[in-house]
Regions:
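An alpha-helical, amphipathic repeat domain used for nucleic-acid recognition
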Residues: 1-163
Length: 165
């Protein structure tokens, strides 16, 4: 199915550019569009530029604080919580973005810990998910199906949510 390809074949290492100025410009273009982790930026730059050039440009972007993996991890964790993702699903998503385990743990601790009122944001998200998506199954008495669906989504509090609803 050739019509699905982007039309570009991967470049061989000897075909990749070593021009740091062009790589820097490309990095700025990518970062202007969306925030990226250092791993994501490196992967995208490495498609057109050599490994050394890509690594140098990423290091420069980190040094200039255009890229901050801790900030990216926390921002992404907030977005995942808003999307009603479990802590486990959020951790997996952040790992796929190329973030270090320490940054992931720190971001998840900041976002998913209970607030001063004692309310657990992950439990609230699970309850909202149950109320929205699985209300009809609960009304039909199929709590087992709801709990199984929550377990597939990586929830650990599904029993408490099932009893509350």
């Amino acid at each position: 199915m050739a019509f699905y390809s982007r039309g570009r074949r991967p470049l061989a290492e000897e075909e990749k550019s070593t021009d740091a100025a062009k790589a820097r410009t490309r990095a700025m273009e990518l970062l202007a569009g969306q925030e990226l982790s250092s791993g994501q930026l490196y992967e995208r730059l490495n498609r057109r530029y050599t490994q050394q050039t890509s690594a140098a440009v990423v290091a420069e972007m980190v040094q200039r604080e255009y890229i901050n993996d801790a900030r990216y991890a926390e921002t992404r964790a907030h977005a995942l919580l808003a999307a009603k993702k479990s802590r486990r699903a959020a951790a997996q998503n952040l790992r796929q973005k190329g973030l270090a385990a320490g940054e992931i743990q720190q971001a998840l601790d900041a976002v998913y810990t209970p607030d001063v009122s004692g309310e657990d944001p992950e439990l609230e998200a699970a309850a909202a998910l149950v109320e929205g998506h699985y209300r009809k199954k609960l009304e039909a008495g199929r709590r087992d199906l709801v709990i199984a669906a929550l377990q597939r989504r990586g929830r650990s509090e599904e029993r408490r949510v099932g009893k509350e609803c």
